[in-house]
């Protein structure tokens, strides 16, 4: 039974899907005007783990995460670089996939883009105007915030609280300072689309409402994103979506905490933004992922090199213990009376599931993984090893690895994968068979340069890493 903290109710709730056995999940993705920073990477990693755990528990997860490919920041960037908005977006969408792929974040079921849904967005806004929830003014379209009775329920603020400090900027034609933009009138030289309200482009909030509706329907199970999106972005999404669809927008809202840099909030003014594109040149991406999930997703994380080094050391400890188990697997035999170890491994697995069932507590899940490694180290020190116990260890290690998304073996950027090595060995065997010894020697030397040693055995050629 999975429980999660619902920002909407401010309490943990038992997860009950709309459709048995299925999870419909929408995660707010990046505005693709630059490489992502470590703060953008956190939700990608955290909600990837959530998805993986649901799948481990047998759910079919439809995981949708959008790209905002038209926005003020993109327009400004395109003007700075003298490139079109689509060109900028394409570049950084590709960079996003590369960066999060390095962090072992699995591809979403769907990555909708704003530009691909422009007709849907325009129709959605038109529907809101027709229903009286929105109005056109001076070429812009605004949402009537006060007309939606539930406004403020996610951020737990009242309309009266919000009214304090609300203002109408120069050039805006709002009925009320609390109203927010659905459609922006085109400015000279900016990318725009034709609509019943005139040339323009959508506001940020309406985009996610429409893409979520198009991809997942009127009501979704889980909507997730960073804490900074709770207000006004997610609050406005609820207002638009529920006014339009006459149904709850999302049953559960999840928000991850911030990442601070050396105990200071990331900000452009401080110049302490750290791009994932740059970090992974210096820090193993597996270590970075392990570092992020070593803290509960709702808690803030402090990023500094000392803490990253601690994560590297912890992951190395886990991997070293797994390597010992793999080595013992070569000499393991069928030994009876090993139930004590089987029971201890099962107890650790049960604890892992218990803490993951409790709002996806990856910090405590990693503690369980450390305990598994400690037990494994103790076991391999014994003179005899049981095939049953070794297989049990390996199976549970693999479960932890799959759920948390942290590989059990390090993959250096220039390191060949095992399947690649096997293919090269097959090619070398074929070359030798055809008496193409030059090619056979070339392959052997290439593998040797990667510290891969070939060994001839009665069962054929095998390899080991030096």
From Swiss-Prot:
The residues that hold ATP are 268
**InterPro entries xref list:** Cys-tRNA-ligase, Cys-tRNA-synt_Ia_DALR, Cys-tRNA/MSH_ligase, CysS_C, Rossmann-like_a/b/a_fold, tRNA-synt_1_cat_dom, tRNAsynth_Ia_anticodon-bd
CC cofactor note: Binds 1 zinc ion per subunit.
What's its catalytic activity? Answer: tRNA(Cys) + L-cysteine + ATP = L-cysteinyl-tRNA(Cys) + AMP + diphosphate
A single GO cellular-component term on record: cytosol
> Which GO terms label this protein's molecular function in UniProt?
ATP binding; cysteine-tRNA ligase activity; zinc ion binding
Motif 'KMSKS' region location, chain numbering: 265-269
- UniProt-listed GO biological process terms: cysteinyl-tRNA aminoacylation
Q: What Gene3D superfamilies does the database record attribute to this sequence? A: Cysteine-tRNA ligase, C-terminal anti-codon recognition domain, HUPs
Q: What is its EC number?
A: 6.1.1.16
Swiss-Prot/TrEMBL keywords: Aminoacyl-tRNA synthetase, ATP-binding, Cytoplasm, Ligase, Metal-binding, Nucleotide-binding, Protein biosynthesis, Zinc
Question: What is the required cofactor set for this protein?
Answer: Zn(2+)
Q: Which residues bind Zn(2+)?
A: 28, 208, 233, 237
Listed SMART domains: DALR_2
Source organism superkingdom = Bacteria
User: Any idea where this protein resides?
Assistant: Cytoplasm
Q: Where is this motif: 'HIGH' region?
A: 30-40
Q: What class of enzyme is it?
A: ligase
What family does this chain come from, according to its entry?
Answer: Belongs to the class-I aminoacyl-tRNA synthetase family.
What do we know about how this protein assembles, alone or with others? Answer: Monomer.
HAMAP family from the UniProt entry: Cys_tRNA_synth (MF_00041)
- This chain belongs to which protein, by name? Cysteine--tRNA ligase
Q: What organism does the record attribute this protein to?
A: Staphylococcus aureus (strain MRSA252)
Q: Name the encoding gene, please.
A: cysS
